[in-house]
Amino acid sequence: AYKIVTSQCTVCGACEFECPNAAISMKRGTYVIDATKCTECEGQFDKPQCVSVCPVDNTCVPA
């Protein structure tokens, strides 16, 4: 599963809508990834979609 580095997240929301597993949601003013839903997009995409769309490098990282 992946996680979002809260201190780097700009709360743009791009990742929430790109996640094919609906694993990303807003909690207490920032986005979080539900590890029980995150599959790292294996079998669906070449790399995790949160990583692909995030405008800030190294914000969506392996947990």
UniProtKB/Swiss-Prot annotation:
Q: Which residues bind [4Fe-4S] cluster 2?
A: 38, 41, 50, 54
For the ligand ([4Fe-4S] cluster 1), the binding residues are: 9, 12, 15, 19
Q: Which cofactor does it need?
A: [4Fe-4S] cluster
Q: How is the cofactor bound?
A: Binds 2 [4Fe-4S] clusters.
Q: Which residues form the 4Fe-4S ferredoxin-type domain?
A: 2-29
Q: Which UniProt keywords apply?
A: 4Fe-4S, Electron transport, Iron, Iron-sulfur, Metal-binding, Repeat, Transport
Q: Name one GO molecular function term.
A: 4 iron, 4 sulfur cluster binding
Which cysteine-cysteine pairs are annotated as disulfide bonds in the entry?
none
Q: Which domain of life is it from?
A: Bacteria
Q: Which PROSITE patterns match?
A: 4FE4S_FER_1, 4FE4S_FER_2
InterPro entries recorded: 4Fe4S_Fe-S-bd (IPR017896), 4Fe4S_Fe_S_CS (IPR017900)
Q: Which parts of the chain are coiled coil?
A: none
Question: What job does the chain carry out?
Answer: Ferredoxins are iron-sulfur proteins that transfer electrons in a wide variety of metabolic reactions.
Q: What is this protein called?
A: Ferredoxin-1
Question: Which species does the entry assign this protein to?
Answer: Rhodopseudomonas palustris (strain ATCC BAA-98 / CGA009)
